A protein has these predicted regions:
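N-terminal pre-domain/capping segments
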Residues: 1-92, 122, 158, 191, ...
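A short, hydrophobic/aromatic-rich structural module that often spans a beta strand
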Residues: 3-13, 79-86, 109-117, 145, ...
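Active-site acidic/histidine proton-transfer and metal-coordination neighborhood
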Residues: 16-20, 53-54, 58, 68-161, ...
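Active-site beta-loop-alpha junctions enriched in small/polar residues
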Residues: 6-10, 33-37, 64-67, 99-101, ...
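C-terminal appended segment following the main domain
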Residues: 118, 124, 226-261
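Hydrophobic faces of well-ordered beta-strands that scaffold small-molecule active sites
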Residues: 3-7, 30-32, 59-64, 94-96, ...
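Gly/Pro-rich active-site loop or hairpin
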Residues: 39, 73, 104-107, 139-143, ...
Length: 261
């Protein structure tokens, strides 16, 4: 299997050091972010591209356009700016996340947003990675909803799914769509006290033997079904971000996953 690393795995590392760490881990694919750390807001795209080339890594995506399914206000301008940045830095895709504040978004609005985003992506040769969020307050929880909306928007070939093991588990999903999946995010929850309905990004750590999200079975199912893309670490927990040696921790998680497979 192919491992990739999202910058959120080691957000305190400068981008060049993060790229170097990824290569040292034996991986060659990375994801950069526009939230924490905000690479888009702090570095010229040309510098990002140069750093990636120097380290020998490929930028899979910029994470993330939010809330992509509410196509109003400044969203279109932000989408164009992110897409332009992606092209200039050498990224291949944009991660697209739905509104996640308890507000219901009509299905027709989801389809309309995908239609509006389609030319922005196609004109730049980018893929849109549509990521259902499994939280109860999410406006798009299920992958089947995303797939149907992509079809209704005529977005086949432009959009792929982001399969996130955390959100797959939270949404209670059982179906896998390897032919639709462009990237997989992996993270674990090990806190035995938190109820599934109360799991948040802050609970997401690296995958180890205490994982409650069935990462190993999800990974096995995806591989068995034919998915051959990267699996990208995306832990949000402060205890991961504060690690003195994130490379060692990631190496340990990689070894655990490989041993389980």
């Amino acid at each position: 299997m192919r491992f990739a690393i999202n910058h959120i795995s080691a957000p305190k590392l400068a981008l060049s050091k993060f790229f170097e760490m990824t290569k040292a881990l034996g991986a060659t694919e990375v994801e950069i972010r526009n939230d924490l750390p905000d690479v888009m807001g702090t570095m010229p795209a040309s510098d990002v591209k140069a750093a990636a080339e120097a380290a020998g890594v490929t930028i899979l995506s910029i994470n993330a356009l939010y809330p992509f399914n509410v196509w109003s206000g400044e969203l279109a301008a932000r989408a164009v700016a992110m897409a332009d940045y992606a092209v200039a830095c050498g990224a291949k895709a944009l991660v697209m996340c739905p509104l996640n504040d308890g507000t219901e978004v009509p299905y027709d609005d989801l389809v309309a947003a995908l239609k509006a985003m389609k030319p922005i992506l196609t004109e730049r040769g980018l893929t849109g990675l549509v990521e259902p969020l499994g939280f109860l307050i999410s406006s798009m929880r299920k992958k089947e909803t995303a797939i149907q909306a992509i079809k209704d928007a005529g977005g086949e070939g432009v959009y792929k799914l982001m399969h996130d093991t955390f959100h797959h588990y939270l949404a209670g999903e059982t179906a896998f769509y390897p032919e639709w999946t462009g990237l997989v995010h992996i993270s674990g929850v090990v806190d035995p006290a938190v109820d599934v309905a109360d799991m948040l990004d802050a609970h997401r750590v690296l995958v180890d033997t205490g994982d409650r999200l069935e990462n190993i079975s999800q990974i096995k199912a995806l591989l068995a079904a034919g998915y051959d893309g990267p699996f990208s670490f995306e832990p949000f927990a402060a205890e991961v971000h504060d690690l003195a040696d994130p490379q060692a921790a990631l190496a340990e998680s990689i070894a655990y996953i490989e041993n389980q497979l």
